């Protein structure tokens, strides 16, 4: 852990995601899935963080599924835009910040993290990821947000 960032190891994680040209409807589609718009009409507890980033010339938004689910037993989305996938385990360099989860706030902290990783000669293995932990009614100064990169790291 540096004074700017920490490196975390995450095991494989099951997610539900939407990839689109603009992310305006992504949250709504994911929320409908966990609210029962799936083949089992099953409601699923929302987990945090919600992650976002760039993928396939578009943008993705992801919800993590609770650990009781596997790719085999997770309810199948009824909306074809909603996909179930696995994020493979790996190491992630993370910088935390408060305030609004705005593009400007994310880009500012992503750049701080990117610069420090380059200074520390840490190899970045993917595009930046935005993680948000709080709903819109949480006061900005109380919000927890993160910018992260998948990195090459040894334990």
Identify the role of each PLM range.
Residues 1-155:
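A solvent-exposed interaction/effector surface
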């Amino acid at each position: 852990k540096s004074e700017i960032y920490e490196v975390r190891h995450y095991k494989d994680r099951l997610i539900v995601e939407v990839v689109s040209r603009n992310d305006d409807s992504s949250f709504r589609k994911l929320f409908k899935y966990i609210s029962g718009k799936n083949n089992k009409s099953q409601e699923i507890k929302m987990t945090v963080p919600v992650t976002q980033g760039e993928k396939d010339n578009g943008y993705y938004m992801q919800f993590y599924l609770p650990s009781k689910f596997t790719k085999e037993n997770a309810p199948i989305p009824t909306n074809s835009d909603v996909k179930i996938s696995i994020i493979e385990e790996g190491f992630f360099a993370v910088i935390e910040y408060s305030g609004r989860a705005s593009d400007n706030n994310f880009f500012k902290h992503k750049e701080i993290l990117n610069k420090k990783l380059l200074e520390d000669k840490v190899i970045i293995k993917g595009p930046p990821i935005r993680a948000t932990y709080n709903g819109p009614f949480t006061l900005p100064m109380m919000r927890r947000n993160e910018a992260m990169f998948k990195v090459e790291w040894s334990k």
